[in-house]
């Protein structure tokens, strides 16, 4: 009846177009679905049929259910009794962790999956190895050990502000939302590298509007990464949670644009030698050279800000928050850590001496164990099988297949880490630690390892050392009974990491 009405009501040419589209699109989808299920080269790889049928199944778990597709893999491996499962039409996940070295070794021909990273930005989204090397080499001096050593005074200043805000909250009998404190701290550090001018996020009594906007955006990150145009349309619907996306994105981008403009203005007005090194300085210096090859590859600061802020803020702040949760949930761990910090208080309390802090064995063990158990980037980071294909288990994966080995598959593997859900820094100390560093993969490995690894370790070590050297703390009821998180490309805590400060051991004050 509907087709008949359309035929009578609409002009002949328009009717034919609509009828053709109405018939061809569903037919094409059905044919494509049949191919994926019964004729695709991966048809014999076990896994959920809906995953084999369409990528929408991953989107369902990531955004609609909001728990994370990657959190389902372990039960599917067990259900299908297979170390290899098909998780998408052209995507496979494996728990054969020995392949991690094959994929990430120096000179690897396993490229990043273009279809997965197409809506990402910044350094991590670059597929071409030559372009990636050019961009990374351009930025690498900002993240070298020498450069990070130069950030210790900035870290010291920010921690002093954290300490002041923490004692003020304690004096007023209020709990401290460590998630927000740590997010502010991590963002402050990455902005210091992004811009040559100083940007203060500590001026607000509560939470900086820029960070609040960023938090709203990250809550919908799977929608942005999967279907950015749909995200734009849905954000225009009033009265929904998504309606906050548009103003949040506007706040975020307006702040970034204003900082870029102000930084550029100051650089034009100042002598080059007086300007602190940063992403921004390096980009504007590049504009006045003949390095056309670099110019065509390296994006403007505004285009890379979101990816660097997301990568440099959420992962580090989340991991540090997890450290607080696990340390305060483990009295014996807390006692051992505090004892070590007390014995070395002179280079924590009287200004941070990072060269000495980074040598503390139990602190390092706590950091490594936190990185392992918290799994800061829990989901797929797929690589494309190179020419010739590869056999994994009893399945041949042809060239072009997207293969993933998630951090969870390694960090929570009980053959590598016995009792993987138990927080045990001792596993990283002494004879028991032999060979474990190989599986410390929180920042990746090889040429595509996270460029901010050294900076992240600075933050993790210094924050934990400072707070647990200075304050006696306890978790509040808001933390729940266990560590609960969701996969929003980076892991996000479901429960607020909130602490009550019992005393300031440096001043002797009790609250």
UniProtKB/Swiss-Prot annotation:
<protein>
    <recommendedName>
        <fullName>Inactive cytochrome P450 monooxygenase cloA</fullName>
    </recommendedName>
</protein>
<dbReference type="GO" id="GO:0004497">
    <property type="term" value="F:monooxygenase activity"/>
</dbReference>
<feature type="transmembrane region" description="Helical">
    <location>
        <begin position="17"/>
        <end position="37"/>
    </location>
</feature>
<dbReference type="InterPro" id="IPR036396">
    <property type="entry name" value="Cyt_P450_sf"/>
</dbReference>
<dbReference type="InterPro" id="IPR050121">
    <property type="entry name" value="Cytochrome_P450_monoxygenase"/>
</dbReference>
<feature type="glycosylation site" description="N-linked (GlcNAc...) asparagine">
    <location>
        <position position="81"/>
    </location>
</feature>
<comment type="similarity">
    <text>Belongs to the cytochrome P450 family.</text>
</comment>
<keyword id="KW-0325">Glycoprotein</keyword>
<keyword id="KW-0349">Heme</keyword>
<dbReference type="InterPro" id="IPR001128">
    <property type="entry name" value="Cyt_P450"/>
</dbReference>
<keyword id="KW-0812">Transmembrane</keyword>
<dbReference type="GO" id="GO:0009058">
    <property type="term" value="P:biosynthetic process"/>
</dbReference>
<dbReference type="GO" id="GO:0020037">
    <property type="term" value="F:heme binding"/>
</dbReference>
<dbReference type="GO" id="GO:0005506">
    <property type="term" value="F:iron ion binding"/>
</dbReference>
<dbReference type="InterPro" id="IPR017972">
    <property type="entry name" value="Cyt_P450_CS"/>
</dbReference>
<keyword id="KW-0472">Membrane</keyword>
<keyword id="KW-0479">Metal-binding</keyword>
<dbReference type="GO" id="GO:0016705">
    <property type="term" value="F:oxidoreductase activity, acting on paired donors, with incorporation or reduction of molecular oxygen"/>
</dbReference>
<comment type="function">
    <text>Inactive cytochrome P450 monooxygenase; part of the gene cluster that mediates the biosynthesis of fungal ergot alkaloid. DmaW catalyzes the first step of ergot alkaloid biosynthesis by condensing dimethylallyl diphosphate (DMAP) and tryptophan to form 4-dimethylallyl-L-tryptophan. The second step is catalyzed by the methyltransferase easF that methylates 4-dimethylallyl-L-tryptophan in the presence of S-adenosyl-L-methionine, resulting in the formation of 4-dimethylallyl-L-abrine.</text>
</comment>
<feature type="binding site" description="axial binding residue">
    <location>
        <position position="450"/>
    </location>
    <ligand>
        <name>heme</name>
    </ligand>
</feature>
<dbReference type="GO" id="GO:0016020">
    <property type="term" value="C:membrane"/>
</dbReference>
<keyword id="KW-0408">Iron</keyword>
<keyword id="KW-1133">Transmembrane helix</keyword>
<dbReference type="Pfam" id="PF00067">
    <property type="entry name" value="p450"/>
</dbReference>
<dbReference type="InterPro" id="IPR002401">
    <property type="entry name" value="Cyt_P450_E_grp-I"/>
</dbReference>
<feature type="glycosylation site" description="N-linked (GlcNAc...) asparagine">
    <location>
        <position position="344"/>
    </location>
</feature>
């Amino acid at each position: 009846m509907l087709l008949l009405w359309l035929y009578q009501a609409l002009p002949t040419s328009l009717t034919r177009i609509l009828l053709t589209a109405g018939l061809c699109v569903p037919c094409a989808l059905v044919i494509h679905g049949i191919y994926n299920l019964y004729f695709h080269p991966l048809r014999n790889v076990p896994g959920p049929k809906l995953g084999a049928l369409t990528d929408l199944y991953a989107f369902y778990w990531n955004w609609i259910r909001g728990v994370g597709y990657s959190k389902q893999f372990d039960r599917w491996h067990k259900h299908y009794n297979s170390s290899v499962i098909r998780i998408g039409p052209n995507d496979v996940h494996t728990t054969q962790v020995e392949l991690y070295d094959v994929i990430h070794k120096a000179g690897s021909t396993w490229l990043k999956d273009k279809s997965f990273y197409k809506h990402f930005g910044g350094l991590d989204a670059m597929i071409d190895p030559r372009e990636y090397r050019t961009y990374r080499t351009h930025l690498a001096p900002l993240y070298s050990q020498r450069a990070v050593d130069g950030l210790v005074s900035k870290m010291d200043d920010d921690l002093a502000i954290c300490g002041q805000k923490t004692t003020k909250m304690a004096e007023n009998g209020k709990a401290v939302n460590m998630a927000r404190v740590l997010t502010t701290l991590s963002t402050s550090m990455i902005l210091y590298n992004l811009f040559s001018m100083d940007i203060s996020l500590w001026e607000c009594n509560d939470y900086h509007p820029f960070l609040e906007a960023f938090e709203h955006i990250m809550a919908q990150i799977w929608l942005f990464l999967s279907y950015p145009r749909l995200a734009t349309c849905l954000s225009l619907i009033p009265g929904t949670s998504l309606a906050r996306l548009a103003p949040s994105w506007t706040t975020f981008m307006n702040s970034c644009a204003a900082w870029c403009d102000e930084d550029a203005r100051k650089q034009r007005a100042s002598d080059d030698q007086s300007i602190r090194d940063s992403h921004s300085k390096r980009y504007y210096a590049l504009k006045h050279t003949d390095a056309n090859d670099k110019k065509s590859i390296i994006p403007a600061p505004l285009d890379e800000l979101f990816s660097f802020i997301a990568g440099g803020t959420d992962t580090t702040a989340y991991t540090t928050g997890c450290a607080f949760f696990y340390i305060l949930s483990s009295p014996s761990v807390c006692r051992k850590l505090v004892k070590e910090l007390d014995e070395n208080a002179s280079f924590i309390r009287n200004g941070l001496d990072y060269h000495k802090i980074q040598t503390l064995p139990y602190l390092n063990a706590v950091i490594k164990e936190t990185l392992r158990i918290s799994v800061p980037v829990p989901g797929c980071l797929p690589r494309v099988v190179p020419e010739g294909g590869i056999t994994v288990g009893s399945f041949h994966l042809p060239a072009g297949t997207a293969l993933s080995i998630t951090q969870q598959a390694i960090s929570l593997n009980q053959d590598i880490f016995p009792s993987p859900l138990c927080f045990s820094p001792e596993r990283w100390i002494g004879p028991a630690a032999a060979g474990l560093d190989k599986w410390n993969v929180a920042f990746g490995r090889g040429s595509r390892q996270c460029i901010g690894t050294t900076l992240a370790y600075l933050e993790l070590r210094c924050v934990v050392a400072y707070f647990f050297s200075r304050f006696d703390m306890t978790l509040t009821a808001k933390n729940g009974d266990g560590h609960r998180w969701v996969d929003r490309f980076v892991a996000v805590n479901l429960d607020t990491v909130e602490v009550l400060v019992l005393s300031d051991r440096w001043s002797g004050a009790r609250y």
